[in-house]
């Protein structure tokens, strides 16, 4: 929790999946801090309040932890304390899926699966102590003031925050929560994967109709959780500006383009078990809707927002350099296997947490209130962008035809043709221009860029999507008059001959078919 900085197998899988990929932890006693904090007067934003005493049970724990930190149990003034960072939330940030777990959190009576390699322990933010109090399976009720414990030996997460805030000087509070509330992301994933194993058909038709309602239901719960964390910090004597409160969204662990991986191992060996169309639905619909909900909660509550929804694009399960763990069955813990045997599946792996840590480090240094993070050039190194992806992607409309540049069939695999189509606002018609790399990314995935195949800069060459690489044949310049030209062949322009023609290179002639807005 706290650390100083540094055939039969198939049937077993199916049976285990049917139980759950992510197990909702049992709810035990109610936080003993409820009366002390839930009704406490809240200081005005930007002003520190007097420190409110903890209830005896929590004060005892605080004193014990202080003695370990400093050699005595005294509560010190802020300026005399060690600095710290803390993460709260669920399996996405606890370290579930990494494979290395802190003692006491890897079963059999506690499955929080906190990893010493989780993101909060690996940032470049200068801090003396890092706390990871997130727990796999947590919902907002396990985090909020007066909430419920997940396990008998766990505190409500806001109580852990209250203790850390009094013993150290917190610089950043990170919250990743919402997936286990109305959304029930784990059970949905369980169902989708199980249906694939049992040949029962895709899960998209089952969940699409009610998905937005699920998102709408979780938004006020996440927003209320942010408010509670603010209250806990004010009760500990912090002004709102004394620390950074960050809400991070969830990346998609799966995608439909796995066969583009030249070393694709197959779905079962690679762990990307599920219908390809369901993977596309998850990436293109389910996760983006969830992200918008988390963003709304962060914005409405005044938290700093980090959009990580596109962070794993190009690094999904079964892709090269994957940042997420695929379907994984631990046959030895527990034994005999049960629902907990597969709970590590479809979560960030150690590389994924390294990516989170990099994004958080950049966000803290940038001082932004809202930013997005992704590996836009397939370098393996995440980069922070001072934009919200929701606002960055826009349709590209042709001046002559009025049609929009469109990835054919809403596909995103390598070689997908690009042309004109009736403007419809879908993600296969959203585009973002990366100023640094001069690349045009399609909204479907951060990892597919407009590409001149084989770098053949010639009249009539058709444009396609391809894995973003930063290569010269994926670099374009936007010239006066709305033309778009290959950086390596600026006498040629992107051209739409008719409303639904393929997008081609043609000699620049100033015609409306070569102008885009």
Language-model regions: role of each:
Residues 1-44:
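Secretory targeting and sorting signals
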Residues 63-135, 193-196:
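Serine-esterase "nucleophile elbow" of acetyl-processing enzymes
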């Amino acid at each position: 929790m706290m650390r100083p900085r540094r055939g039969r197998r198939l049937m077993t899988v199916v049976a285990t999946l049917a139980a759950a990929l992510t197990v909702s932890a049992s709810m035990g006693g109610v936080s003993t801090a409820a009366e002390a904090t839930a009704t406490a007067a809240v200081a005005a934003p930007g002003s520190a309040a007097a420190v409110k005493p903890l209830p005896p049970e929590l004060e005892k724990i605080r004193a014990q932890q202080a003695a370990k930190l400093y050699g005595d149990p005294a509560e010190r003034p802020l300026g005399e304390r060690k600095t710290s960072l803390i993460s709260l939330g669920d399996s996405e940030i606890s370290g579930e899926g990494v494979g290395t777990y802190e003692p006491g959190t890897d079963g059999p009576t506690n499955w929080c699966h906190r990893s010493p390699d989780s993101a909060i322990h690996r940032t470049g933010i200068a801090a003396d102590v890092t706390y990871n109090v997130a727990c796999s399976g947590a919902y907002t009720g396990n985090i909020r003031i007066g909430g419920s414990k997940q396990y008998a030996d766990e505190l409500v997460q806001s109580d852990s925050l209250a203790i850390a805030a009094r013993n150290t000087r917190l610089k950043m509070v990170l919250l990743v929560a919402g997936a286990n509330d109305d959304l029930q992301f784990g059970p949905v994933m369980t169902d989708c994967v199980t249906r694939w194993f049992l040949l029962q058909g895709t899960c998209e038709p089952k969940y699409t109709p009610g998905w937005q309602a699920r998102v709408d239901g979780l938004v006020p719960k996440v927003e209320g959780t942010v408010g509670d964390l603010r209250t806990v910090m004010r009760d500990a004597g912090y002004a709102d500006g004394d620390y950074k409160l960050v809400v991070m969204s969830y990346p998609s662990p799966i995608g439909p383009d796995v066969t583009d991986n030249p070393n694709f191992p197959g779905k079962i060996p690679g762990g990307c078990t599920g219908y390809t169309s369901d993977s596309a639905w998850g990436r293109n619909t389910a996760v983006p809707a969830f992200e918008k909900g988390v963003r709304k909660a962060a914005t409405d509550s005044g938290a700093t927002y980090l959009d990580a929804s596109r962070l794993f694009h190009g690094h999904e399960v079964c892709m090269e350099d994957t940042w997420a763990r695929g379907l994984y069955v631990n046959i030895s813990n527990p034994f005999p296997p049960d629902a907990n045997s597969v709970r590590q599946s479809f979560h960030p792996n150690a590389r994924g947490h390294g990516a989170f840590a990099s994004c958080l480090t950049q966000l803290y240094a940038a001082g932004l209130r809202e930013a997005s993070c992704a590996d836009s050039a397939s370098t393996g190194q995440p980069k922070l962008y001072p934009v919200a992806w929701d606002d960055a992607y826009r349709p590209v409309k042709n001046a002559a035809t009025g049609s929009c540049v469109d990835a054919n069939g809403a596909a995103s695999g390598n070689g997908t043709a690009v042309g004109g189509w009736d403007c419809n606002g879908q993600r296969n018609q959203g585009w973002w221009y990366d100023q640094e790399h001069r690349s045009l990314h399609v909204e479907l995935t951060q990892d597919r860029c407009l590409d001149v195949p084989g770098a053949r800069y010639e009249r009539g060459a058709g444009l396609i999507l391809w894995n973003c690489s930063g290569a010269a044949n994926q670099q374009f310049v936007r010239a006066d008059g709305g033309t778009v030209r290959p950086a390596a062949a600026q006498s040629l322009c992107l051209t739409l001959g008719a409303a639904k023609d393929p997008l081609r290179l043609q000699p620049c002639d100033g015609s409306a078919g070569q102008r885009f807005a």
